[in-house]
Amino acid sequence: MSETATWQPSASIPNLLKRAAIMAEIRRFFADRGVLEVETPCMSQATVTDIHLFPFETRFVGPGHSQGINLYLMTSPEYHMKRLLAAGCGPVFQLCRSFRNEEMGRHHNPEFTMLEWYRPHYDMYRLMNEVDDLLQQVLDCQPAESLSYQQAFQRHLEIDPLSADKTQLREAAAKLDLSNIADTEEDRDTLLQLLFTMGVEPHIGKEKPTFIYHFPASQASLAQISTEDHRVAERFEVYYKGIELANGFHELTDAREQQQRFEQDNRKRAARGLPQQPIDQNLLDALAAGLPDCSGVALGIDRLVMLALGAESLADVIAFTVDRA
């Protein structure tokens, strides 16, 4: 397509028709399983504290708010969906727009479509099985394989990520010619993420989707810490053909612990010169009121459709990428 014809969609019309069919198939998948489709706000007065996520910010200046209200476009519908769960809605899913002020490229667009769903009374493994069912149905792929985070590092880097110190992690990075980055990095989790991205991801999910589970407890985010091994979190990610597709948790339900994690995130943000973010008190109040034991997962629809169609880029499956918006 001509670079000058920016009024035209980035994706072909046949691809958009196939995308619509996949969206309908996903809705049938959940309807058949009795999971309620919901809609939640795209904007909130609070946002994520995660140091790796960068939300878009806007300002409401309507009647009665002459001073204005800061609002953030949602990076995920997670917080609002958990409030619905605490209110007793039962299992829910959502197909929605999410926004992240970060990368743009083959696998990234600042505005993207997210599939997120939550299953009360599911543990992490049961939800992983359901994700696998969905992937097999949409992608017509083989059943997934599963590796713990520890097993993945031991297999591909010959190092134990749960016990290795920073010197050992830097030595592993040197074998990947990453010393220029690793030698000046003091944060252990950043070193682990560097090794995972460069030393593990290229080797997994080539022939079938691969679940990586039991991430280090320091990377728990909104997941519970394992009661069987306090070094790891009940968190998983899914990779297929070089693409990260999904990120799931056995959800943390303790409001006090969640608040402590948010505050710790903001301390890390301050140490890195990043703005501290407003904590979502409504979410904490919902957790305090009683979030049911549940597991949840977020899956990138644009990436899923890209894989299903054998496309080379998100631009091939999105009507208008940000450069044509």
From Swiss-Prot:
One of its GO terms (molecular function) is lysine-tRNA ligase activity. It is an enzyme of class 6 (ligase). PANTHER family: ELONGATION FACTOR P--(R)-BETA-LYSINE LIGASE, LYSYL-TRNA SYNTHETASE. The keyword Cell cycle does not apply. Disulfide bonds: none annotated. One of its GO terms (biological process) is lysyl-tRNA aminoacylation. Its EC number is 6.3.2.-. It catalyses: D-beta-lysine + L-lysyl-[protein] + ATP = N(6)-((3R)-3,6-diaminohexanoyl)-L-lysyl-[protein] + AMP + diphosphate + H(+). Belongs to the class-II aminoacyl-tRNA synthetase family. EpmA subfamily. It comes from the Bacteria. With EpmB is involved in the beta-lysylation step of the post-translational modification of translation elongation factor P (EF-P) on 'Lys-34'. Catalyzes the ATP-dependent activation of (R)-beta-lysine produced by EpmB, forming a lysyl-adenylate, from which the beta-lysyl moiety is then transferred to the epsilon-amino group of EF-P 'Lys-34'. Homodimer. Substrate binds at S76, P77, E78, Y118, E251. This is Elongation factor P--(R)-beta-lysine ligase. One of its GO terms (cellular component) is cytosol. ATP binds at R100, N101, E102, N109, E244, L245, G300. Pfam families: tRNA-synt_2. Keywords: ATP-binding, Ligase, Nucleotide-binding.
